[in-house]
Regions:
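A conserved regulatory-domain signal marking ACT and ACT-like small-molecule sensing domains
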Residues: 1-143
Length: 143
């Protein structure tokens, strides 16, 4: 459906919810308001879709990234300084490389990547965005 209609999806995340009978799909896409409305209309036509909601820009959103960085002795202090500054975690450490976990909004993840490029990124993987509205209302309680 997405390819046929020309939607440009930036990220797609699927996971469990508080209700075992439902999964939540978070779609992050770029495009104009018309493309967004077309996507919403197409999703609402699908039988298995319970609810479609567009979240406000001030919603709570997070992304997870794992990134492997070259572990050169001359760069270790600077890398660890960046890890601390970004509240990241070193989750694996060898003589050749280290794997760092970073969680935050997408702009934080992007900034961390730019900071790590000079040290040598070996490999990286991003989860895509997960998001919730602020407050106590839920997606299903808004019906």
């Amino acid at each position: 459906m997405f390819t046929r209609r020309g939607f440009n999806i930036d990220a797609l995340t699927v996971g469990e919810t508080e209700s075992p009978e439902y999964s939540r799909i978070t779609i992050s896409l770029s495009g104009d308001g018309y493309a967004r409305e077309q996507l919403i209309n197409q999703l609402r036509k699908l039988i298995n879709v319970k609810k479609v909601e567009v979240l406000d820009d001030d919603c709570i959103k997070r992304e997870l990234m794992l990134v492997k960085i070259e572990n050169k002795p001359e760069n270790r202090a600077d890398i660890h300084f960046a890890v601390d500054a970004y509240r990241a975690k070193v989750i694996d450490y060898t003589n050749e490389g280290m794997c760092i976990e970073v969680t935050g909004d997408p702009s934080k993840i992007d900034a961390f990547i730019k900071l790590m490029i000079p040290f040598g990124i070996i490999e990286m993987c991003r989860t895509g965005i997960v998001a919730l509205d602020r407050g106590t209302s839920t997606l299903l309680s808004k019906e």
